[in-house]
Amino acid sequence: MQCPYCHHTDSRVLESRSAEGGQSIRRRRECLACGRRFTTYERIEFVPITVIKRNGDRESFDRSKLLRGIMTACGKTNIPQQKIEALVDDIEADLQLRSRREVTSAELGEAALQRLRHLSEVAYVRFASVYRQFQGISDFVAELAHLQETPASPELLTISQS
């Protein structure tokens, strides 16, 4: 592993431990040339997922883009960062378990909404307003009425396999 400080290629591992719920290994390393310490992560490399946008364009699934959108929806709700990241981890794990390598942005948005509803109704409405492109107050009122009429399902559905 190359040292990020002096770019020397030899280092020794001081400590290794499981991270990100067992999805990666965190290693503390020490450069044998300069003696500085740094952290590396080893992760499983998953098969890339392609997202089919509303207009038909295709782009690679971007975890950070989904995380940003959900974090924006959760702003000022006092939801811990760890819970938000766990929600995104759950969606990403669901995507990797599927037999298909493509997912529509609609499926991705619905998966996020379903999980957000269990986390925070405020975050749910905020995310829905962007995802479903609310045009006015009537859209908010309709969504709030739907929230009140329809109980949240006790278990989370996975993203469609078909």
Curated annotation (Swiss-Prot):
Domain of life of the native organism: Bacteria
Stored Pfam families: ATP-cone (PF03477), Zn_ribbon_NrdR (PF22811)
Cofactor mode of binding and number, as noted: Binds 1 zinc ion.
Record's signal peptide: none
Cofactor(s) the record lists: Zn(2+)
Zinc finger intervals, unnamed: 3-34
The ATP-cone domain, residue ranges: 49-139
UniProt KW Transcription regulation keyword: yes
UniProtKB keywords: ATP-binding, DNA-binding, Metal-binding, Nucleotide-binding, Repressor, Transcription, Transcription regulation, Zinc, Zinc-finger
Gene Ontology BP, a term: negative regulation of DNA-templated transcription
Sample GO molecular function, one term: ATP binding
Biological role stated in the UniProt entry: Negatively regulates transcription of bacterial ribonucleotide reductase nrd genes and operons by binding to NrdR-boxes.
Family: Belongs to the NrdR family.
NCBIfam families for the chain: transcriptional regulator NrdR (TIGR00244)
HAMAP family: NrdR
Stated name of the protein: Transcriptional repressor NrdR
Organism, as annotated: Thermosynechococcus vestitus (strain NIES-2133 / IAM M-273 / BP-1)
This protein's encoding gene: nrdR
